């Protein structure tokens, strides 16, 4: 059996906390001898995980770059791992941290200093999907062929990911979390974040000083927070819930058969701390309010495989050298790195499906760089190729983008597709890379052309989650 072993790292930089997880990944080539390699994870073993530590942020809300790097390198040292010995990795920045003014440059600099890592600055949709995968909700949904809703409740947000038979069918994000009111060790509020203040104002009147709230009033606030979280599940939102939504709603009329709770508040829901203010916030009180909520008690709430560590544990990477002149490459400056892949779910409406896939990745179709994947089940027939061409032309017309049009396909018709597409998109840099197998959540690198431009090396990077 053709297998590869990798030492990988997953770094999750969240609103409140950061964590580092080292893993040993084993991949097996499932392709036949004559086919392009197609690797899948067969073993994912967490070899070391750091304590959860607070994300270093300055008073202006920016990430403290040097301090963050020092903290992460300390975890390498504690694990007894040298940065150069790591084969692959993923850095995910989520929640309010992803919105800080220097988030992207700070994480890119960190990635370059540590190695060849996937970097994802996750907005509310992608954060929901990553947490749902990391918690094990996607696997549970796939194994039981049912609808599973994971709600990842952290410091600043509650992120919802709905899986139907293993496929993501909806995401949402509500600005409710356990650290919206920060406290001292005695439960006195020392700082109220804006969404937290909005909830306080609704409970006790506009202009209420959150620092004056009693313990009983904090319980009242967290009960309202729990109600807001449940309103999103039911799809009946109060004006306050509507104001706190960061995204659209979950699909209407769809009832999850299982609900799982992850994130820091999910961990408190599972193991309630004796001291409700041990984290200097109201997270444990919110977990208690969720426990006591009558509507949640009616639902099938189960503990997920992971709660506070519902995140990536690394990334598997494998290089594919593409065969002879099967690709189309014109006007594209290579190499390109860390390109997210948009995979269409609905094959009958490719334009809408690509747009939806980009929304799930928190990407703007008109400004961001990405790769459009073709459906794996698309037949290698002339009629199917024409359908794809019409969809790509329509997509480019609806979403003009300064980046090259990059298309990836598992089928062996890259050259034909490129030749037929070129006359209709005359000024647009275009690459069609075929015989590459990609899955939801993958990123790819496209290397410098070889053999006179007929072959490019492509690296497919798949995020790894706890097994």
From Swiss-Prot:
One of its GO terms (biological process) is protein repair. It is found in: Bacterial microcompartment. Its main location: other. SUPFAM superfamilies: Actin-like ATPase domain. Pathway: Amine and polyamine degradation; ethanolamine degradation. The keyword Chaperone applies. It holds the Pfam family EutA. Reactivates suicidally inhibited ethanolamine ammonia-lyase (EAL), cyanocobalamin-inactivated EAL and O(2)-inactivated EAL; requires Mg(2+), ATP and adenosylcobalamin. Reactivation probably occurs by the ATP-dependent exchange of cobalamin. Belongs to the EutA family. This is Ethanolamine ammonia-lyase reactivase EutA. It comes from Escherichia coli (strain K12). The lineage of its organism: Bacteria, Pseudomonadati, Pseudomonadota, Gammaproteobacteria, Enterobacterales.
């Amino acid at each position: 059996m053709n297998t590869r072993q990798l030492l990988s790292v997953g770094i999750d930089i969240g609103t409140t906390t950061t964590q580092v997880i080292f893993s040993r990944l084993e991949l097996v080539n499932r392709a036949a001898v004559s086919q392009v390699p197609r690797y899948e994870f067969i073993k994912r073993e967490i070899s070391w995980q750091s304590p959860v530590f607070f994300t270093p942020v300055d008073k202006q809300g920016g990430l403290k770059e040097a301090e963050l790097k020092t903290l992460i390198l300390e975890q390498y040292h504690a694990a007894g791992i040298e940065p150069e010995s790591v084969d692959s990795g993923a850095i995910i920045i989520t929640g309010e941290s992803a919105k800080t003014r220097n988030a992207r440059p700070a994480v890119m600099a960190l990635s370059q200093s540590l190695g060849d890592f996937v970097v994802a600055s996750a907005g509310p949709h992608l954060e929901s999907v990553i947490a749902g995968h990391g918690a094990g909700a996607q696997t549970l949904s796939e194994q039981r062929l049912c609808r599973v809703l994971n709600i990842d409740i952290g410091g600043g947000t509650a992120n919802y990911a709905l899986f139907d038979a293993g496929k993501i069918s909806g995401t949402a994000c509500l600005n409710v979390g356990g650290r919206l009111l920060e406290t001292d060790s005695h439960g006195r509020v020392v700082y109220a974040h804006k969404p937290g203040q909005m909830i306080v104002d609704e409970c006790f009147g506009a202009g209420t000083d959150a620092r004056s709230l009693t313990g009983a009033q904090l319980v009242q606030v967290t009960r309202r927070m729990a109600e807001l979280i449940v309103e999103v599940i039911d799809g009946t939102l109060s004006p306050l819930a509507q104001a706190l939504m960061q995204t659209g709603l979950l699909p209407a009329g769809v009832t999850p058969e299982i609900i799982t709770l992850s994130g820091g508040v999910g961990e408190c829901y599972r193991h309630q701390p004796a001291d409700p203010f041990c984290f200097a916030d109201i997270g444990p009180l919110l977990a208690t309010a969720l426990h006591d909520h009558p509507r949640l008690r009616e639902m099938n709430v189960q503990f997920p495989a992971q709660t506070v560590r519902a995140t990536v544990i690394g990334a598997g990477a494998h290089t594919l050298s593409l065969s002879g002149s099967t690709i189309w490459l014109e006007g594209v400056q290579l190499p390109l790195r860390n390109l997210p892949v948009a995979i269409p779910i609905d094959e009958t409406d490719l334009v809408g499906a690509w747009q939806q896939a980009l929304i799930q990745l928190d990407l703007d179709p008109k400004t961001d760089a990405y790769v459009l994947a073709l459906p794996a089940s698309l037949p290698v027939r002339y009629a199917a190729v024409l359908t794809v061409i019409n969809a790509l032309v329509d997509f480019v017309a609806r979403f003009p983008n300064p980046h090259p049009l990059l298309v990836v396909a598992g089928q062996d018709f890259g050259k034909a597709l490129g030749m037929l597409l070129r006359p209709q998109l005359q000024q647009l840099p275009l690459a069609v890379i075929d015989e590459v197998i990609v899955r939801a959540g993958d990123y790819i690198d496209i290397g410098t052309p070889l053999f006179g431009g007929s072959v490019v090396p492509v690296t497919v990077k798949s995020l790894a989650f706890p097994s």
